[in-house]
């Protein structure tokens, strides 16, 4: 059996992106990282406590799997974004550092392990995301719901944000399941402008992702909706504003915009570093358009300070 088809084998970097429709073409000379792109190094006992809890419960975080630059700061403050359903994704998005392959079966004990970890970490706000699971009948929606229910049972005061995949080909079923067990915040990222989807999000569809957000809001008007994009993949400022307008037209409440950073040479190159002034301009436009909260800046990620992002919207 070819290793590529074996269950549980994780491919990263060039091994992951080799088969995408539009190949990754590295720049002859990488753009120099500007001085405003700086991450804080992991420090403090709390960082290592979080790591130990995660390992003991056999849990994954997107902070680790996607090589997030903010991991030191978030772990040190006792926050983490849990990544359920394993650490192997069925998609090959060339901006993302999560591994690709044929995933293992779901762990039926994961919801309980997650709930125990949330309680042990004394989290007031938790973000749950996942790999894409195109191999599952419901795309993993029921597993999300099981995790929400388990956390509600053991930590009823904890606010829950879910960052979901697109549930391609099974959207209605997924919406039914997640409407029966709603989170406090429903997040699904558009990631980039529609012109760049074939290159950056092979297998995804811009209109479908917008429809997911709109349909969930229609079914659950009291649940806050959220989405985010990266800049630096080749989009123009005008395209960024067009995406923002599309999100507002689909009743999305909260927004994140951050700088794309290349995880490895096998990933899409950074084509521009957006300046702090331009991020401020995007933020102003977002509020002018009616977003209830906009987190905009070079180091912003979808779940970075998610508790602070949501506080003024859901309380």
UniProtKB/Swiss-Prot annotation:
Residues 75-292 form the Radical SAM core domain. Its cofactor is [4Fe-4S] cluster. Binds 2 [4Fe-4S] clusters per subunit. One cluster is coordinated with 3 cysteines and an exchangeable S-adenosyl-L-methionine. Keywords: 4Fe-4S, Cytoplasm, Iron, Iron-sulfur, Metal-binding, S-adenosyl-L-methionine, Transferase. InterPro entries: Aldolase_TIM (IPR013785), Elp3/MiaA/NifB-like_rSAM (IPR006638), LIAS_N (IPR031691), Lipoyl_synth (IPR003698), rSAM (IPR007197). Coiled coil: none annotated. It comes from the Bacteria. It is an enzyme of class 2 (transferase). One of its GO terms (cellular component) is cytoplasm. Its main location: cytoplasm. This is Lipoyl synthase. It comes from Laribacter hongkongensis (strain HLHK9).
């Amino acid at each position: 059996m070819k290793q590529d088809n074996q269950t549980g084998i994780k491919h990263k970097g060039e091994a992951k992106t080799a088969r995408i429709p539009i190949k990754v073409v590295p720049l002859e000379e990488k753009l120099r990282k500007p001085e405003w792109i700086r991450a804080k190094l992991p420090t403090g006992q709390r960082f290592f406590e979080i790591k130990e809890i995660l390992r003991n419960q056999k849990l994954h975080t997107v902070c680790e799997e996607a090589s997030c630059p903010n991991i030191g700061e978030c772990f040190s403050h006792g926050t983490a974004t849990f990544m359920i359903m394993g650490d192997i994704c069925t998609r090959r998005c060339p901006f993302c550092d999560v591994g690709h392959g044929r995933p293992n079966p779901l762990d039926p004990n994961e919801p309980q392990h997650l709930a125990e970890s949330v309680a042990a970490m004394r989290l007031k706000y938790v973000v749950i995301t996942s790999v894409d699971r195109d191999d599952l009948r419901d795309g993993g929606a029921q597993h999300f719901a099981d995790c929400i229910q388990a956390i509600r049972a053991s930590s009823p005061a904890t606010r829950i944000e879910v960052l979901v995949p697109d549930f391609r080909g099974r959207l209605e079923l997924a919406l039914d399941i997640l409407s029966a067990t709603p989170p406090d915040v429903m997040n699904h990222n558009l990631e980039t402008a529609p012109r760049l989807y074939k290159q950056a999000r092979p297998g995804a569809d811009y209109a479908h992702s917008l429809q997911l957000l709109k349909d969930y809001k229609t079914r659950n008007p009291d649940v806050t909706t959220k989405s985010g994009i990266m800049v630096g993949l080749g989009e123009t400022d005008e395209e960024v504003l067009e995406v923002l307008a599309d999100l507002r037209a689909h009743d999305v409440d909260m927004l994140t915009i951050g700088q794309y950073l290349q995880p490895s040479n096998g990933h899409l190159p950074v084509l521009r570093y957006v300046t702090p002034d331009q991020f401020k301009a995007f933020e102003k436009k977002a509020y002018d358009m009616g977003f209830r909260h906009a987190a905009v800046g070079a180091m912003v990620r979808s779940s970075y300070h998610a508790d602070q992002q949501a506080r003024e919207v859901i309380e």
